[in-house]
Amino acid sequence: MATSSSAFDDELPMEEGMPELLDDEDVPSTLPSLLEQNLDTAPKGDEFKLVKRKRKSGNAIDVVMEDVSQVDEDATADTADDSTGPKSSKRTKGVKGESRVVPVPKHRYTPLKDNWVNIFTPIVKNLGLQVRFNLKKRQVEIRNPVDREDTTDLQKATDFVRAFILGFEVNDAIALIRLDHLFLETFEVADVKHSLKGDHVSRAIGRIAGKDGRTKLVIENTTKTRIVVANTKIHILGAYQNLKLARNAVCSLILGSNPSKVYGSLRNMASRGAERL
């Protein structure tokens, strides 16, 4: 996955950036008829069945009349028996009282405990959800109220907790609750360049962070994103277009680009943004 400085010459990141719409050529001109798709070819109850009976002489066809109503009653009875059996524990989307679970690794147990007040306050007060930390299973459990079916706030709270577990600060992760156009992207160093092994992986991670974290800070401030480097995984939080620019910068550093070259591209992009403003 090769990138160059031209990747930073795209349009400036916009807070409300969205993917481009499809061209008319990509959209099919006609759709199949619903009548054809839902055409019922099953035999009706008042129809006859033609049954071939093997005979030694000739291939005569006998008409046999079956009691279809009896077959329907048997099928209904089987369905009723299945419905009385054990129900699946998997809940469908929109069920009242639906819950989500976010597992907590060992190294994030203490930070979660220290920031627990700052985490459950926006979830309970702003979103009106129920949240608890299961000490036995070491996971955060978030649940919708019994009288609510909408899962939008439930998903926002789940993304907020997950972002904190990945290593983002509470003040940065809470933007997932307040803003609707933010996304969270995760990839590994090996996804960019498979041939990196041993010390080369450490050097690539060092180029991303920079001395005293300056390189990462420059990318964050220029692209208006937040980046977390956790071992060989890179997590980026930001708007759609901003994620693209930050990802290109990080990938360029992983592939061996000189940090000064990346700095120059970011400075040019920042200067163009200042001129437009």
From Swiss-Prot:
Subcellular location: Nucleus, Nucleolus
Main localization (coarse): nucleus
BP-aspect Gene Ontology terms: ribosomal small subunit biogenesis
Biased composition (Polar residues): 30-40
Signal peptide: none
Keyword tRNA-binding: no
Keyword line: Nucleus, RNA-binding
Entry keyword Ribonucleoprotein: no
GO molecular function annotations of the record: RNA binding
GO cellular component, one term: nucleus
UniProt biased composition (Acidic residues): 8-27, 72-81
Classification via Pfam families: KH_PNO1_2nd
Annotated region (Disordered), positions in chain: 1-52, 72-100
KH domain segment(s): 198-250
Family note: Belongs to the PNO1 family.
Record's function text: Part of the small subunit (SSU) processome, first precursor of the small eukaryotic ribosomal subunit. During the assembly of the SSU processome in the nucleolus, many ribosome biogenesis factors, an RNA chaperone and ribosomal proteins associate with the nascent pre-rRNA and work in concert to generate RNA folding, modifications, rearrangements and cleavage as well as targeted degradation of pre-ribosomal RNA by the RNA exosome. Positively regulates dimethylation of two adjacent adenosines in the loop of a conserved hairpin near the 3'-end of 18S rRNA.
Oligomeric and partner information: Part of the small subunit (SSU) processome, composed of more than 70 proteins and the RNA chaperone small nucleolar RNA (snoRNA) U3.
Listed name of the protein: RNA-binding protein pno-1
Gene behind the chain: pno-1
